[in-house]
């Protein structure tokens, strides 16, 4: 099964589960004093965020969020300069447990993780060292790569603030996404030696260097702030 097909199936399953849980929770909450729904706008290390929170009991809330953003920066790996483009896109289903009945809460859940990183070499000189061999920029063309992550990513964290409160409320989250070991692919594009086996071998060596740098993203820190409104 392809990665894109798996993501579509997981996303559909998450939507179906979310709708089912919300309907069930609404039925239960219709007879208690803790019924409530809140929507939010916010942002953090996963990007800009929209969220919907539904009370399940006095101290338990269901939260659905969608995060999206783009960010670019420059970096260097094994002597090669790269332009990196981060594409953030994720949808999460979370359970907030207000352990002591106040603002403090524990949060667990999972993300449908479409976060990706695109990389392209920034060749400023006449030569470029790929792996352990020096080539001319004309021979290499440019190096292009993609870094992808597990489609399903568990989340664990804690925070402060009650989404289901009177009127507006501010909530803070701090946690970790367990998105697994990244998968790196790298290729040479537009060079006179793009099909040369020596260059291809060195590109594979360069890919391994990128993989080592990307491995640190298996645990992704989450810090976010949101403004909720109960209606």
Tell me what each language-model feature is.
Residues 96, 100, 169, 217-231:
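Outer-membrane beta-barrel "beta-signal"
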Residues 39-41, 50, 58, 62-64, ...:
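Transmembrane beta-strands of outer-membrane beta-barrel proteins
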Residues 45-47, 66-72, 99, 110-116, ...:
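Transmembrane beta-strands of outer-membrane beta-barrel pores
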Residues 57-59, 100-102, 163-165:
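Outer-membrane beta-barrel channels and translocator barrels
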Residues 42, 51-53, 96-98, 159-161, ...:
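Transmembrane beta-barrel domains of outer membrane proteins
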Residues 66-93, 115-153, 180-218, 222:
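Extracellular/periplasm-exposed beta-strand and loop segments of Gram-negative cell-envelope proteins
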Residues 34-36, 55, 103, 107-115:
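A membrane-pore/channel beta-structure motif
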Residues 1-36, 214-216, 231:
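Cleavable N-terminal export/targeting peptides
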């Amino acid at each position: 099964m392809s990665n894109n097909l798996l993501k579509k199936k997981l996303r559909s399953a998450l939507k179906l589960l979310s709708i089912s849980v919300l309907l069930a929770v609404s039925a239960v909450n219709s007879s208690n004093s803790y019924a409530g729904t809140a929507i939010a706008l916010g942002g953090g290390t996963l990007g800009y965020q929209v969220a919907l929170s539904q009370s399940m009991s006095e101290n338990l809330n269901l939260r659905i969020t969608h995060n999206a953003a783009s960010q670019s920066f420059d970096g260097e790996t094994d002597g090669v300069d790269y332009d990196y483009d981060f594409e953030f896109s994720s949808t999460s289903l979370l359970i907030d447990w207000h352990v002591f009945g106040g603002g403090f809460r524990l949060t667990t859940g999972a993300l449908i993780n479409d976060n990706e990183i695109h990389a392209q070499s920034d060749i400023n000189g006449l030569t470029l060292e790929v792996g352990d061999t020096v080539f001319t920029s004309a021979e290499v063309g440019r190096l292009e790569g993609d870094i992808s992550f597990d489609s399903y990513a568990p989340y664990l964290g804690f925070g402060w603030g009650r989404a289901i409160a009177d009127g507006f409320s501010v909530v803070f989250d701090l946690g970790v996404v367990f998105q697994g070991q990244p998968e790196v692919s790298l290729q040479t594009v537009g060079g006179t030696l793009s099909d040369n086996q020596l260059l291809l071998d060195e590109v594979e060596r360069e890919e391994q260097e990128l993989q080592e740098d990307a491995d640190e993203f298996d645990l992704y820190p989450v810090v976010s702030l949101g403004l909720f409104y109960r209606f």
